[in-house]
Structures are given as structure tokens and as C-alpha cells.
Amino acid sequence: MVQWLAMLQLLWLQQLLLLGIHQGIAQDLTHIQEPSLEWRDKGIFIIQSESLKTCIQAGKSVLTLENCKQPNEHMLWKWVSDDHLFNVGGSGCLGLNISALEQPLKLYECDSTLISLRWHCDRKMIEGPLQYKVQVKSDNTVVARKQIHRWIAYTSSGGDICEHPSRDLYTLKGNAHGMPCVFPFQFKGHWHHDCIREGQKEHLLWCATTSRYEEDEKWGFCPDPTSMKVFCDATWQRNGSSRICYQFNLLSSLSWNQAHSSCLMQGGALLSIADEDEEDFIRKHLSKVVKEVWIGLNQLDEKAGWQWSDGTPLSYLNWSQEITPGPFVEHHCGTLEVVSAAWRSRDCESTLPYICKRDLNHTAQGILEKDSWKYHATHCDPDWTPFNRKCYKLKKDRKSWLGALHSCQSNDSVLMDVASLAEVEFLVSLLRDENASETWIGLSSNKIPVSFEWSSGSSVIFTNWYPLEPRILPNRRQLCVSAEESDGRWKVKDCKERLFYICKKAGQVPADEQSGCPAGWERHGRFCYKIDTVLRSFEEASSGYYCSPALLTITSRFEQAFITSLISSVAEKDSYFWIALQDQNNTGEYTWKTVGQREPVQYTYWNTRQPSNRGGCVVVRGGSSLGRWEVKDCSDFKAMSLCKTPVKIWEKTELEERWPFHPCYMDWESATGLASCFKVFHSEKVLMKRSWREAEAFCEEFGAHLASFAHIEEENFVNELLHSKFNWTQERQFWIGFNRRNPLNAGSWAWSDGSPVVSSFLDNAYFEEDAKNCAVYKANKTLLPSNCASKHEWICRIPRDVRPKFPDWYQYDAPWLFYQNAEYLFHTHPAEWATFEFVCGWLRSDFLTIYSAQEQEFIHSKIKGLTKYGVKWWIGLEEGGARDQIQWSNGSPVIFQNWDKGREERVDSQRKRCVFISSITGLWGTENCSVPLPSICKRVKIWVIEKEKPPTQPGTCPKGWLYFNYKCFLVTIPKDPRELKTWTGAQEFCVAKGGTLVSIKSELEQAFITMNLFGQTTNVWIGLQSTNHEKWVNGKPLVYSNWSPSDIINIPSYNTTEFQKHIPLCALMSSNPNFHFTGKWYFDDCGKEGYGFVCEKMQDTLEHHVNVSDTSAIPSTLEYGNRTYKIIRGNMTWYAAGKSCRMHRAELASIPDAFHQAFLTVLLSRLGHTHWIGLSTTDNGQTFDWSDGTKSPFTYWKDEESAFLGDCAFADTNGRWHSTACESFLQGAICHVVTETKAFEHPGLCSETSVPWIKFKGNCYSFSTVLDSRSFEDAHEFCKSEGSNLLAIRDAAENSFLLEELLAFGSSVQMVWLNAQFDNNNKTLRWFDGTPTEQSNWGLRKPDMDHLKPHPCVVLRIPEGIWHFTPCEDKKGFICKMEAGIPAVTAQPEKGLSHSIVPVTVTLTLIIALGIFMLCFWIYKQKSDIFQRLTGSRGSYYPTLNFSTAHLEENILISDLEKNTNDEEVRDAPATESKRGHKGRPICISP
């Protein structure tokens, strides 16, 4: 009977498992009624209404509010990929149907493209598109409305539902190149919101990297921090008998930050290298499989130098001898070069393999650091300074490093060594007290590779390098180190340089040492500190009664380090300690609550995503985030307290911030009371937008930094400054110094200039992807995390009393002030009105004109501060004798006036009078033009806002010619090769027809010609020659060009042979379907035959009939290039556009190549309105995808550096793409009818060898070898040893698949070998099996086969996707290819609940039947695990892992062999059910 009761419980658990809930959570639900800690650790929570105290439960077709005290699996939620909210019990994501907003919210399949599934938190609100928020109706139904409703996580403390965001898990091994997991993913019919072990023999956690594993078969193992607490698990390797583990991720391709994040998730860090022995161990395990790998070396802390990401001291250096100063300064992340085992600096956004390291003995350094902060009273000889049982003496007789060493040794001391941050603090204070700026310390190196050692013989356990240090001086074997006063940082110096130096020796510690602090208090510097262990509210702790005289204030990183060591002895998990920082008045700025004198905030040490909100009080945290600061509720939260009091009554130094009254230099700007000046560098004034690091370097050239806001008043000023310069409707984003680049800063945000973070700049910004480590500022007081490599404008900040430097490249311009697309120059030296009219003209500007009240306000605000130069300022207005004859000096009409009343009473005068503006009132008046006054000039950049009018009326063209843009075009590509022409022959043909070779004056004409080259394989002559490439053959100037970047004018290309370099060249337009070259221009031999051509001539206007094609209405259905397009007209959102397309049995248009783009460019120009296209993003603009599933690398953005402005894309009237909010209303959409193609079955699976394989159609490919550089012959032999062949490309689909996979490796791979050979006899290229190369891609021109060197080999150049000849001895990556060899095993298909509605009775029957089967099996097995995976007699293949081989990976999951290749039901399913683009069905849930 007991067994049957247990079986009933198991039956219920089995039902939960079928619904997709994790086994462990299902077990929890059987015996707990409150949300468990395990749920929270997995990121699962229950959503509770803050006001109603009820919780959201997913029902059959609606969401309702239910009693929270009876939790079930349908109440469990989790944030998953792309900001989706996943319901564990319902196996679906919360979605909003934009087309039916009145409907209640419900669950949808998580990869649906027809429903809005993205949500974000905003002050306890759950907000979706169109500002719709999760709300509740009176019947407790959950709906979307624009009213506010607040939600919290149902826990004992009522946490925030966004405290557990979805984080990218970067996969290990597998075949996904390290790409992050996608959650949820579907496997065997079930959706999984977490990594699983099912289907994997070794029971390691794994995930898919696309939403449906069976469709793409992309997967990898999950990082698991719990897998190696005391030993190295299967994915790690151990270094001999040490307790250090290494993980070689040589098939991954990640940026430095992504690699760093991957290692951190496993409890490790990117590789640090302590010495040559460790480097030798690493080199032996790389086996030259890859060229370069990421290591933990970086200089991402703007205030420090090079460092290891795990905090290991940087004393061993092995920089490559070839490294130049440029990359060393510009690139901030380090790599290990495999062949030379030397280090290089790289752009951190490059994608490379990486190595993780984990030290199982990581606590030893923490114990040592804690001891260094303990106070010890010390006695020293006269003139020596005591500190922590040692005595120090700064000697001011300047000596070389060796001289300093001998001098100290002669006094029975050593040249100072530094073993801790506590000693750095003492060093800084000693230098300040002695008024010294720099000193020798005892660190030096006399080795190659460089290995710094202390002259005292002590171990190097701590380093503290200055920015860009340690720099290895060229041609110097001996290197010596100094320390500077400002922050104690170290620099590498020439040992012969003469500096001050510090000697160090042992001191005397008295037996009865007294710290000077009361009992129970600890001393640090001049203060005593104590922990009050009683839990109190902030009001109680800060009252002065329990913590006398006050709570702790922290002023520096040194004091913070001391506090961290102090609380480490009592800090347990989830322990907190009050400090004096607070924002109780809800001002938005955190300040110290002190008794008496105000103390400014000089330093902050926030935890990740802190400060989370305004109006709170601050605690220091214990446990895993030891020492970090967090905001808590001042009244309700209880914590211990940190107290601070001076050792004795000192004369306190004035700590009030001094406000310098020096005006800002040059054209930097500030406001009264601010200690800093700011300058906005916007696109109108600089050559290009810049990345965050480039912008910071730009500011540093002026002696400044990217802007920081040390006070809320500074942010207010910058916001007003931006409003004064730019139209508020402009979506501009500016880099500021806010960043979290420093890997040692635990993911917390900081200012690049070291200013304290005093405000909650990123309220509820929980969705901060690993790639977004820098912040941009918008003019609505909003900070947005952004990818540091993206390009933006920027703002610099400099202290008011610091004079900016002027870099050599800086071209000083008079201090013009920018305001809404115009600039203004204020001349403070008075002169007559006529003089300034001449001066403004000489400066290529106009006398000031004022066209609006806003411009009037801007001018008045500026001259108000310049009143000392004069009250009256000339403007560009004059009047004659008659009052109504008044106009601006540039001839424009007066459309805005702001006259003083006195003007109306003025007596008319025949004398000419000129107009001024008052700096006091802003009103206008008149004055004698000869009176000298200050004045204002204005220069305007004219923006064209209307199309050019047609030069003539529409005409006609001869038969066979194409009419476009009031010209006639003839595209001629003869089918008979004998009729193809030279450039001269083509020009003669065109002249004979009354025209010339084409001259292209605009992007629109270029698009028209390009669209008419679709399907052609022959390039065409156009009317340009190299002898005069600035004029067309018809004499018109070249005002538009479309040259190929790979074919620069007058520079021989890589295919050019020696005898071709001096022959005449003429221009061709490429018809190559590769979008890198489609429509591009390039030069070739004018005398070469074999090309088509394009003629043009003027239209015929003698006849009066109008060309119908150019003026008639555009039909709603158009055919082009094997596609059918439909035009939808009317105002609509992106979602409504998609719905309208589907009503026409179509999809929002995808644009796969340059030909279709050219067609749509011409079409949109005719339509005259912007139109939606099918492009959208779910990751804040990192990647955009086509809604119909099309995958193409082709893009046509207006500006690749454009700011990300929304999740959906449209095409403008020039065809260019822009992003905008999906809820915006545009005037139409472009659809295309999707052709339903029957999917071909490609049976068989990839066999397992020493490399992993990815299947495409009927073949398997090894991409792990692309990082293994070999000669052609070695690569060919390697593939043969694997039972495969070197890559041969048979068709365009295969070529697209290969490029998509290869582009994931980024810049790590440039070329791979192709299995082709050149036949010298007949000058042709053939595959190695003898078949011809029907699929080829030579780029702009085919190589000259007659002048090739003997026996060349062929590579695929990945960035352009073209083929290229290269010597066979070169070392390149390669891909092996073979037919899918393992036959698929027949299995019955599984159907998940998300695909059908299962009646309750049938479900119960199946559960009962399954229960009986499980009971029988349990009786048979007796001791077997009831949930062990059952395997029948299908002959399933279980691959064995062997991680000792660097490139040996597992790529076949057990389930791969259980595919049903004969499933006719699935094969014949309607297209609307099988295509991802049509997944918008709600998920129905069984009760």
C-alpha cells in the first residue's frame, strides 16, 4: 500500500515533468508551501500584486490572480533570453497581441515572431511595447493597459521581480563556437528553461543555442560552478600536483568580455600567467591548434595599468618583440600568441578562443591581505617613520636605482618593497608629507622574458601599476620601478634616472602596545572603528546613541579595503552593515549624514546594479560580495552598524569642496557653482563618431575625461546644455564616462575619472547584457547601457581651474556656439554695424538672424552673461525711413519680432538706423548704425528638405530602351560572346545610337541600373576612364561614385600582373551576386573584350504622350527576381504591418541581396514614403533578424554608426534602413509572398571522429579546424585521416551556410583552403575529384589564368566571401567535409503540449498507463532509479568524451540517433505550422 501511495505521488510528479517543469522543482512542490531559496537561486519567482497581495497564475487561455499561499507550477515565472517572461508550468512566454490589445494577456510559444514577447521592469511595473503595462481587471484577469500597477516577487521580504535577470551562458565544447544558450529551447517536444542532462551520457549539463534543437542541432555544455569544488571535473585539466585547473576553449569564438564572463560563471577567471613554467604548461596543451587565445591580461581600469582579471600580481611579462606603441596604447585586452608564446594587445571586441583558470586554493591571499590592515604600534630611530612593525625613511638625495639600493643597504635597510594596499596607502601619505612626487622602490628586472623581483628577496604578491604600465623599454635589459605620489601607482623607468628613494627596515613592537582606541575598537590611521552587531534600522543606527559620534564615512579605496578586512571576520552570507550614506530626503543624490560639518562624497564602492533607487540608505554587504555597497529601506530594513571616531581630537581639515570661480577656458561651458566645465563633441563638429575608448582618449588629449556627474547639479546642467544645442526631437546619444569595463570591479558601474557615483543613474536597469559595459546619455536625463565598441558622439569634462591642452591635430576654431543646426559667434569688441556686416561675411557667415522664440531665448541666455561687454548687441536687422521696409541683412523676411515698446513711440527719422538686442531684457531696439557695439554672427548648415524638381516634362524612349529619371538607358549584355565589347567598342555603339556610355549622377540611378543586372553573369562598361576619373565621358563632373573598396583607383589590384600596371583602364560595373561587389565600380583594361555595357541618352520630349511607367499609379503587386512583392498602404505599426501582410498570404519583406535592395530603392523613391520591412531585433540592436526566417549578411543601414532607436526597421525613400520603435506609425509596408518549397529529406547523421561535425543537408562539416593553420597538403591529409575531404563548395546554398558559420569566428579566421586544383594544361580550375567548379566566386574579376605561378592553391576569403589564389605552402585554416554516414534510427515522434490541445481524459489515461509501466519496470529493476533514462534495443550510439585532446569534442547527443526520418505526418504538415515565422499560437494548458 505504501508503494502505491508513493506511486501516486510519482504520477503527479511525472505530469509536472511532462509540462516542462524541472524535476527538482516538481519535488519541491510536493512538500513546501512557500517559495524556496532553490527557486530563487534558479531565477524562478512568483509574481505578486503589491496592492492586492495575490499572484499571477497562467490558466488555459488567460492569466488570473490567485491566492499566493497555494503555489503551483503555473505560478512560477522566470526571465529568459531576449527579455521574455517564461511560465514554468505552462511552458510558454507572456505575450501581448498588438493587433488585439483588448484581449487578456496569455502565453505564447517563446520563439513567436508575431507577438510582442519583450518586457522590462520600471519601478516595479512590468512594461511592454507602446507603454502598455501588466494590469488587472476587476474580474482578476491579467491584461495590458497604460495604467500603473506594481508587482513584486512573492517572498518573505517582497523582493524585486527583476533581481534575477537572464544572463548569457556561454557554451563550452559542442558545435556552437561558444555561443550563449537560448532559453527556453525545445528538445524532444519539451521546452527547457534551464540546462539539462537528458540526452547526454556523461550527464553533463548542456543547452541548445537556438530555440529548437532538432531544427538546428547547435549545442554546447553549460558552465557549472558547482562541478569542481575540490577537484578538476571533465571539462578542466589539472597542472600536475597543483590545485590549479585550466579549461581550453579552443573551439569558441568570443569577445574578451564574453570570455571573461564565461570563466566567472564557472568560479574561475581568464588565464593569468605567473611564470615561465606555467606558460610552458599552457603552450604544450595548445598544440598549435589555434593562432591566438584570450588571456586575462587587460588595462580596462582607467585609473590603473595592465592587470590580470583574477587579481594575480603582474610581475612576469612576455610581450611580443614585434608589438608597437600604437596597439599597446589603443588595444586594452591581452592575448597569448601560440607559435611564439608571446603576448599581444588586441581590440577587446575581437572574437577569439580563450583559456579559463581556477585556483582551488584561492583563500590564502585573502588571509594575508587581512593581516596587513591590522594596527601594530611601532618604535623607530629618529627621522624614520613607523608603520605596521616596519620603519621607513624617504631620502631626498637623488640617485640612480642601483645607487639608491646601495645607499639603503649601507644603512642596514632595503630599498622599499610593497606587499599590500595598506602599504601603498602609507607610501602615498609619506610622499605627501614630504612633498615628494616620485620615488624609487625596490622592484626591478634583469631577465628576458621580463620578471620583476624585489631587491629584498621577498616574493612579489602585489602589484599596483600606473596607466599603460608596465611599459617595456626598447633595447633595455634592466628595468627599474618607481612609485608616484597621487595614488601610489608604479612606473617602469630607466634605471639610470635619478630620483628620491625610500629605505625600509624592521621596527620595534612594544610588548604592551596600545592602539589609542577604546576596547573593542580597531585602529586604522587616525581613526577607530567598531562593529555594532545588533540589528537596527538606519534611523536607530544613525541617531548617535548606539554609534557615537556617527556612522562610518569612507573616503578612499584604502579605507574601504580596511573596512572589508574588518567585517570579514563577522560577515556571513546575507549580512549587512549600515554606513552614513543616505538619500532620506529623496533628492536623487546620496550624501554622508554627519554631525556638524558637511563631508563631501569622495569615494564609492557599489555592488552590481547599485545604487538601485533613490531615497534609500546604504549598507556594506558581507558574504560573496564582501565590502560592496547596496541601497536598502531606511525604516524597515535591519542591519548591523559600522561606527567611526577619531583617535583624538584633530584639527579637522576643511573638507568642503572648493568651488573655483575661474571662468571656463575657451569654448568649454559651465554654470555658476559647478567645479567643472563641459564640452559637447557632436557629429557636426568632428570627423566621425567614436567608440567609448576612442572618445575617452579624445578627451584625454585635452587633459580631460569623458563627462561624469559628481553632483546632481552637474547632470542637470549637461541636460540643459544638450537641450540648448539640439532639437528635442533629435534622438542623440552621447558617450559619458559611466562604465563597468574593469573586470576587478565585480560588474559595478563607475566613472572613468574616478568621481564617486552618487545617484541612481540606472534605475531598474536589470537587463544589462555582458556586451554592454559603457553608457550613453540622452537629453531626457536617461543613461542607457551600450556596447563600448558602438560609435556615438561624446561629452568631455575638465576641472574649471585646469587649462585644456591643445593636441597637434586640433584645429582651433573661433568659439562658435552650436544651437539646432546653426552656430553663433559672439564678438565682444565693439564696432559699427557695417563693420560687423563685413566681418561676418568674411567669416563665411551672416549677421545674426532670429527666426523663433526659442532662438531668441538661446541668444538672450548667452549675452546675459556677457553684459559687462555691453548692454546693446548688434543683430542683422536694419530699417530705413519707412517702418514697414525692414528685413534681415541676408535678405530673409522678418517672421519673428521682439521689439521694446519704446520703438513704437520713436519719432521717424530719415537717418538709417540699425537694430540691437538688449542683454538685460532681450528686447529689440534701434540705434544709430555708427555707434560701436558688440555683435553676433551666425552660420547655418542648409538641409535640403525637398526633392529636386524635374528639369523637363516627362518624355519617351526608343523601343528596347528603359525610361527612368527623365533619361533613357540601354542595358546590353549579348548572349553571343562574340558580340561582347571593349570599352571603346561599347562607347562607339552608344554614340551610334545617339547617346554615350552611362553617367550615373545619384544613388537612385545606380539602383535602377543594378536592378536591371539581376541574373546576369557579365559585368558592364560605364562611362569613366582612369585618365580622367573625375569626369564622365560625356563631360559631366563626377558627383556620385560607387567604387569597390577592394579596387582603389589607380592602384593595381591583387589580380593585376606586372605587365598590366601601365595600360589604360576603364570603369566597369559588377553584376556579381556577392553583395560585397554587386553594382560596385572598378577599373580594368579598356581593351579587354568580354563585357556588356550600359548606354544612356536624353529622353524624347517632342512627342506629347507621357511615359506611363513613370507617372501612373504603382500597382499593389509587383514581380521582380523570382519574387512577388505586395505594397500595403495606410498608417500602421510594425505589428499591424505584419498582420496585413499575412492577410495577403505574404510576409513583411526580407531583403536578401543588393539586387532586391536596388529594386526596392527605386520602388520606394516612386512611392515617396517610408515603409516597414521585416527586420527586427530582440536584443536591443545587437542583432537584427528577418521575420520570415531569411538569413543573409546583407545590410543597407543609412549609417552603420546610427544610434539604435527601436526594435523594428523601415526603409526610407532612398531605400536606406533605419531602426525605430515597433509601435511607430508609418505610411505603408512592403510584403513579399513566401514561396512554399517542399523540404528535401537528408537522412543520415554525422559519424564521430576526433573532431566535431555540423550537418547541413546531406553533408557533415568540421569547423573546429578553421583555427588550425596548416599548409594545403597537411590540411588535405588531415581530412583524409578523418575519413573526409577538404572543403568543396557545390552550390550557392552551401556557400551561404559556410559563410554564416565562419562569420561567427570574427576576425580570428580570414581564409580557409578549398579542395581545388588548377590545371595548367587547359588553364581551368577543377575540384580534386575531377568535377568542374560550377560554383565559383572570384569577386570583381576572374584572375588572369595565363599569368599564374605554377600550381597555385585556392582559399575562401571569409570577410568578402570570395575565392583567391595563394601559395600552397601558406598556413591557412581549413574545413573537412564528408557525407552524412550514420543511418538515422526510426522513432515515433513526440508531441509537446505546446502543439496540440489534449483532452483531460486522454491525458489521464496516458498518465495511468505510464504509471503502470513504471511500476512494472520498478519491480523488475528493484533498486534502479525510477527516473533513470530508459534505453531500448535501438542500438543507440553513446560517444565517449576525451578531453585530453585539445580539439576532441562531443557533437552527437543521444537523441540525435532517435530522429524519425520517415515521419510523414510532420513532413506533410502545412507550411504555416512548420515555419518559425508563423508561430503565434497561444499555448493552452491542461487544468
Swiss-Prot record:
The keyword Acyltransferase does not apply. Widely expressed. Present in type II alveolar epithelial cells and a subset of splenic lymphocytes. Present at the surface of polymorphonuclear neutrophils (at protein level). GO terms for molecular function: carbohydrate binding; phospholipase binding; signaling receptor activity. Disruption phenotype: Mice are viable, fertile and without evident histopathological abnormalities. After challenge with bacterial lipopolysaccharide (LPS), they exhibit longer survival than wild-type mice. They are also resistant to lethal effects of exogenous sPLA2-IB/PLA2G1B after sensitization with sublethal dose of LPS, suggesting a potential role in the progression of endotoxic shock. It is a single-pass type I membrane protein. Residues 42-165 form the Ricin B-type lectin domain. Residues 241-357, 387-504, 524-643, 673-797, 819-938, 964-1095, 1120-1231, 1256-1377 form the C-type lectin domain. Induction: Following exposure to endotoxin (at protein level). A motif (Endocytosis signal) lies at residues 1435-1441. SUPFAM superfamilies: C-type lectin-like, Ricin B-like lectins. Keywords: Cell membrane, Disulfide bond, Endocytosis, Glycoprotein, Lectin, Membrane, Receptor, Repeat, Secreted, Signal, Transmembrane, Transmembrane helix. Residues 27-1396 are extracellular. Residues 1418-1487 are cytoplasmic. One of its GO terms (biological process) is positive regulation of cytokine production. Residues 176-224 form the Fibronectin type-II domain. The secretory phospholipase A2 receptor form may be produced by the action of metalloproteinases. It contains all extracellular domains and only lacks transmembrane and cytosolic regions. It is however unclear whether this form is produced by proteolytic cleavage as suggested by some experiments reported by PubMed:11830583, or by alternative splicing. Residues 1-26 form the signal peptide. Residues 1463-1487 are annotated as: Disordered. Disulfide bonds join 55-68, 93-110, 181-207, 195-222, 263-356, 333-348, 408-503, 480-495, 617-634, 699-796, 774-788, 840-937, 914-929, 1066-1086, 1208-1222, 1279-1376, 1353-1368. InterPro entries: C-type_lectin-like (IPR001304), C-type_lectin-like/link_sf (IPR016186), C-type_lectin/snaclec_domain (IPR050111), C-type_lectin_CS (IPR018378), CTDL_fold (IPR016187), FN_type2_dom (IPR000562), FN_type2_sf (IPR036943), Ricin_B-like_lectins (IPR035992). Gene3D superfamilies: 2.80.10.50, Fibronectin, type II, collagen-binding, Mannose-Binding Protein A, subunit A. C-type lectin domains 3-5 mediate the interaction with phospholipase PLA2G1B. The endocytosis signal probably mediates endocytosis via clathrin-coated pits. Receptor for secretory phospholipase A2 (sPLA2). Acts as a receptor for phospholipases sPLA2-IB/PLA2G1B, sPLA2-X/PLA2G10 and, with lower affinity, sPLA2-IIA/PLA2G2A. Also able to bind to snake PA2-like toxins. Although its precise function remains unclear, binding of sPLA2 to its receptor participates in both positive and negative regulation of sPLA2 functions as well as clearance of sPLA2. This is Secretory phospholipase A2 receptor.
